[in-house]
Amino acid sequence: MKVLAAMSGGVDSAVAAARAVDMGHDVVGVHLALSRSASGKRGCCTPRDAQDAAQAAQAIGIPFYVWDFSEEFQEKVIDNFISEYSAGRTPNPCLRCNEHIKFSSLLRRALALGFDAVCTGHYARVFLDEDGTYQLHRASSWAKDQSYVLAVLQQAQLKHCYFPLGATPSKKLVRQEADERGLKVSKKPDSHDVCFIPSSNTGAWLSQRIGRRDGDIIDDLGQRVGSHTGAFAYTVGQRKGLRLSSPAWDGKPRYVLDIEPISNTVVVGPRESLRVDELSGAFTTTGWCFTSRPIECSVQVRAHSDPVSAIAFIRDDVLVVRPDEPVFAVAKGQSAAIYRGTRVLGQLMIDNTKKYASS
């Protein structure tokens, strides 16, 4: 099989490429240049990362190239990130990158050049079912599982995905293997933050691009309790950094409950008001056919949160998910991954949430 290995400059993608070679595949390494800047200090798309990827490819013994996807990344990921926050929503840029860059733009180019699959260092597994369906499953290591950010992939993409690390029990073993292979990235730290925000201060980064927008912070009773310089700098569930001018009447902490972009208002209140009993919105599937008939499943609303048992069904052309127990601090724009056991059924882009009246 002819494999294009996407090499970020990290240890996971380097070991994945090496394993692809071990399996006898014809492997070519490629680093995606995603930043328009010639400098950078952190993330997965800096000049240093490109150098690390090139060194890893040389150590593995495979051809290596750098492909410029900065224009697509700007449009599909960065601009989307800014517009979503401007609209009071909370996007996941890693998911958008997988959807539009790694397994869309990159995959299309790979197929056009005669490659059979794109190999990445994601911790997930793909199986071919007897009926010809490609199933996306969690990784063997739930601690490192990344199926949440891959749940948006569909059959045409899964058919060409190759995840050599999916059955690896732990990241420690991957680092150990990299060290044994002589890969200098064996001890390189993981990247956890948004790769295109060097400071990791999302609010300040957004403010530089959107501009200052003064507004009010109100409580759930409509009373003004503070002010802000940009509602886009807040997200549902946030507790720290609110700088409220008056304490809560009950003395308990306040959390961001909602962001109203039209009035440029941030609404705060007690944690109980963050409870969500129903999620709904547009959806994609990995091959599963959702219908109006409810199915038992589980839902995961964040990359590193625990799944919650739920039911899912179609209502008025949108996917509705009702967790068996409430989930908290779910923002519009977030993604929810739907599972049956370890299998990923699909992805819900959360447009609406509901809280049922307490009994």
From Swiss-Prot:
Record-listed ATP binding positions: 6-13, 32, 121
Site residues (Interaction with tRNA), renumbered to this chain: 122, 334
Biological processes, Gene Ontology terms: tRNA wobble position uridine thiolation
InterPro entries noted in UniProt: MnmA-like, MnmA-like_C, MnmA-like_central, MnmA-like_central_sf, Rossmann-like_a/b/a_fold
Keywords linked to the UniProt accession: ATP-binding, Cytoplasm, Disulfide bond, Nucleotide-binding, RNA-binding, Transferase, tRNA processing, tRNA-binding
Location(s), subcellular: Cytoplasm
Region (Interaction with tRNA): 144-146
Assigned GO CC terms: cytoplasm
Catalytic-site annotation from UniProt: 97, 195
Enzyme class per UniProt: transferase
Bridged cysteine pairs (disulfide): 97-195
Top-rank taxon: Bacteria
Gene Ontology MF term list: ATP binding; tRNA binding; tRNA-uridine 2-sulfurtransferase activity
EC code: 2.8.1.13
Gene3D superfamilies associated with the record: Adenine nucleotide alpha hydrolases-like domains, HUPs, Translation factors
Reactions that this protein is recorded to catalyse: S-sulfanyl-L-cysteinyl-[protein] + uridine(34) in tRNA + AH2 + ATP = 2-thiouridine(34) in tRNA + L-cysteinyl-[protein] + A + AMP + diphosphate + H(+)
Cited function: Catalyzes the 2-thiolation of uridine at the wobble position (U34) of tRNA, leading to the formation of s(2)U34.
Family in the record: Belongs to the MnmA/TRMU family.
HAMAP family associated with the record: tRNA_thiouridyl_MnmA
PANTHER family: MITOCHONDRIAL TRNA-SPECIFIC 2-THIOURIDYLASE 1, TRNA 5-METHYLAMINOMETHYL-2-THIOURIDYLATE -METHYLTRANSFERASE
Protein name per UniProt: tRNA-specific 2-thiouridylase MnmA
Name of the gene this protein is made from: mnmA
